[in-house]
């Protein structure tokens, strides 16, 4: 039986979580959230959830386990869920090395859905998330983008995506694009 492992990728504020929530709600696919390891470690170390601490922990985890760290940490959960479901959605796969790890494991069953939004749209969304993960200003936003692209090799998975959805409109447009992608699997 064919398996569908879909990674939703994109820059911060592009709409990855909105896309993932939609797939969870409409299709009932189980989710593996790569960022869970970061939040678990923040809690273990008693650190506040903010951009600086998240970055510190991500770098620490990657220093310990390599650039494919989050994929390595997620693989046991993915394997377990694939015993129960033929479809899984992966949220927040970042690095090229993570992409290669999952691609090597699952081959053609693994697909990437990139969500793209302009920097201005993403900044506005992130400013509206102030309670979740505060962002101070546009300069911090640009620094965060640079760090994610250069420090986590984030561009690779976005560049090789099987489908790119432009998320500049409303949620109905985003949902329609996701439905079209899933129909073609």
Language-model segments: residues:
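Hydrophobic positions on the alpha1 helix immediately C-terminal to the Walker A/P-loop
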Residues: 19
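P-loop (Walker A) phosphate-binding loop of NTP-binding proteins
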Residues: 11
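ATP-dependent small-molecule kinase phosphotransfer cores
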Residues: 30, 34-89, 93-104, 120
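Conserved lysine of the Walker
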Residues: 16
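Conserved phosphate-donor/acceptor-positioning beta-strand/loop module used by diverse small-molecule
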Residues: 91-92, 105-129
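Short, well-ordered beta-strand core segments
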Residues: 31, 112, 163-166
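Small-molecule kinase domains that catalyze NTP-dependent phosphoryl transfer to phosphate-bearing small molecules
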Residues: 68, 131-177, 181-184
């Amino acid at each position: 039986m064919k398996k569908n492992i879909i990674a939703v990728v994109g820059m911060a504020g592009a709409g990855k979580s909105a896309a993932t929530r939609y797939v969870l709600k409409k299709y009932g696919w189980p989710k593996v959230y790569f960022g869970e390891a970061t939040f678990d470690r923040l809690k273990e170390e008693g650190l506040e959830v903010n951009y600086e601490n998240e970055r510190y922990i991500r770098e620490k985890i990657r220093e310990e386990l390599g650039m494919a760290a989050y994929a390595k940490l997620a693989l046991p959960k993915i394997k377990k869920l694939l015993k129960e479901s033929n479809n899984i959605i992966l949220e927040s796969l970042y690095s090229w090395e993570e992409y290669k790890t999952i691609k090597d494991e699952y081959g053609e069953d693994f697909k990437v859905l990139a969500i793209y939004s302009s920097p201005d749209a993403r900044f506005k969304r992130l400013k509206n998330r102030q309670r979740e993960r505060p962002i101070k200003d546009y300069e911090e936003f640009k620094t965060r983008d640079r760090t994610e692209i250069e420090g986590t090799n984030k561009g690779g998975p976005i560049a090789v995506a099987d489908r790119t959805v432009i998320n500049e409109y409303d949620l109905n447009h985003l949902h329609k694009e996701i439905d079209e992608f899933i129909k073609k699997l």
